[in-house]
């Protein structure tokens, strides 16, 4: 059996020795439930950390697009100009005005999820999280890789305003479900 596909996209293509598809499609990840439960039960921002290409960004993007009227994504690697833009903000109102201008779309209070991706290259965003969450107008998600190594020099970690979940590749149960093993076999 061979596993290949586009990493980080929760897509899996499994082929047996004869080349026949065993599984070709989306995988139900436990991470999807973790994200949904977080936003249903907490007002803190959610930070997904972990290795590259394990589905962090995909999971947040999927959740945000399915559950919010307005989903705003800023990727600090693909949009490096955003780093300086946010570094110069003086207040939450100034930060949100800069953000709205940067993404060129209106922000809907109570119905917008902001997703800051690749935060390891913009540690200042973590300092802002406390103040953004306190304002209570929007919801926030962040993701990044190698955060423990990259975020040593953060001015202020937002304790109590940020919930961190470490994301790993598929666990065994997710894998066997992806190849079509049913609940009866798994529960036995």
PLM region spans:
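Phosphate-binding site recognition
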Residues: 1-188
């Amino acid at each position: 059996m061979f596993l290949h596909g586009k990493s980080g996209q929760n897509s899996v293509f499994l082929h047996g020795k004869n080349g026949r598809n065993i599984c070709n499609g989306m995988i139900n990840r436990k991470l999807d439930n973790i994200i949904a439960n977080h936003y249903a039960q907490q007002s803190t921002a959610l930070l997904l950390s972990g290795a590259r290409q394990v589905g962090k960004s995909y999971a947040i993007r999927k959740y945000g697009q399915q559950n919010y009227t307005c989903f705003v994504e800023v990727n600090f690697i693909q949009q490096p100009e955003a780093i300086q833009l946010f570094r110069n903000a003086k207040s939450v109102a100034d930060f949100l005005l800069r953000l709205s201008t940067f993404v060129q779309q209106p922000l809907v209070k109570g119905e917008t999820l902001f997703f800051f991706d690749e935060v390891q290259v913009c540690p200042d965003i973590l300092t802002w999280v406390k103040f953004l969450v306190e304002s209570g107008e929007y919801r926030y998600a962040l993701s990044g890789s190698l955060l423990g190594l990259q975020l040593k020099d953060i001015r202020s970690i937002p304790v109590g305003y940020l919930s961190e979940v470490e994301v790993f590749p598929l666990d065994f149960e997710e894998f066997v479900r992806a190849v079509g093993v049913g609940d009866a076999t798994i529960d036995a």
